[in-house]
Amino acid sequence: LRATGLILMKGRGWEYGKRLTCGFIMRVDCIVLGAGVVGVSTALHLQKRGRNTVLVDRRGVSEETSFGNAGLIQREGVYPYGFPHDFGALLRYAMNNTIDAHYHAAAIPKLAPFLFSYWMHSRKVRHEAIARQYATLIEHCVSEHDALASEAGAQHLLRRTGWMKVFRTAREQDARFAEADRWHADFGLNHRKLDAPALRSAEPHLTHDLIGGLHWTDPVSVSDPHGLSMAYLARFEALGGAFLKGEATTLNQSPDGSWTVVAFDGTVITARDVVVCLGPWADLVTQGLGYRFPLAVKRGYHMHYRAEGNAVLNHPVLDHERGYFLAPMLKGVRLTTGAEFATRGAPPTPVQLGRAEPIARQVFPLGERLDAEPWLGNRPCTPDMMPIIGPAPRHKNLTFAFGHAHHGLTLAAVTGRMVAEMVTGEAVFVNPEPFRPARF
């Protein structure tokens, strides 16, 4: 120790050393890169299993994609969002003037290979096969969040109200009702069909122009998605875990097989295992390790509003034909938009919010804006619409957990448990084979 200038101290299960000339060394069992809701859930599950874990992110916890989602734990979401094959829908999206989809024309050449593969995987037979595999994750999404939220004292953030699609035309309503019946038969998903009077009873402050709704009753909504992540973080830290700010691209594997990451304060974190939960930024690490995953981002925007007068929104609501979503949050009514196809880091273009706001005001009495500017987030997407979860094919003690697209919040607790079971050598409670990184 004198020769190396290292002073070792014991933390709560981890070794923390101070090298007199070059900062701190922190020895732990696991490093989790990325402190979105997937990363926080993974770190918590590892810490619960006695693996001393450090969570690392360049920003605060859940300050990127996980901050601004629609707040749904989508128990009904067995079919991941596919690329449309209907010619009318494709023509409508090509006009680039809708709320549910928008694209940067300059980005299309770069995105074209991804979009073509996405389109191919969205063909009916293939999409149905994907849904059967995806459902093995989705079926546990509520129960796994319930378990973590109970431990973290965050059950008050979970609302058991489900969510609603509301309709303007009988054609769309009939089609979605028939689809819901098929999903109930195939996957046991529960719903209520609402005619106009039933919808007005459930949501008296929505416009009476709507003809009905589909109420998915199994999902859970979250009144403060960022608050849920912070509760999971607090539980993780109470069990002895640590969160440090640092740059994931400093990840390096030593000759002895251990992994190191350097925090912004100079701390060198070293561990046997590392888990990459970097969402849309995963490629910044994986490409340097020789992996070329076909990732793309779907961007999304949100804005909060005060409800006018005594108006109350009782459920999260999707205006199906218009393509925007209203969710009651602690901060106000959150208006979210559909997907924007652009390159990661391109300047914000919140045109979808601009299109949605006047229509949403006709549906529900929104008051003043509560945010200084629109929020922008990036959803990490794979062309087969399934996340990448599992051990890296060519590196020991490296595990991937990213690519959850629209279902990062939904699948965070499920993914965290799966990864922790993989790392600790337990039997994995969901068959991980369909989600293995090696499929790409």
Predicted regions and their residues:
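N-terminal Rossmann-like FAD-binding beta1-loop-alpha1 element of flavoenzymes
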Residues: 29-54
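Glycine-rich FAD pyrophosphate-binding loop
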Residues: 48-67
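Active-site substrate-recognition segment that forms the wall
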Residues: 71-73, 77, 81-120, 250-253, ...
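Rossmann-like flavin
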Residues: 112-231
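A conserved beta-strand/loop element that lines the FAD pocket in flavoprotein oxidoreductases
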Residues: 237-248
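C-terminal catalytic lobe of FAD-dependent flavoproteins
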Residues: 321, 365-440
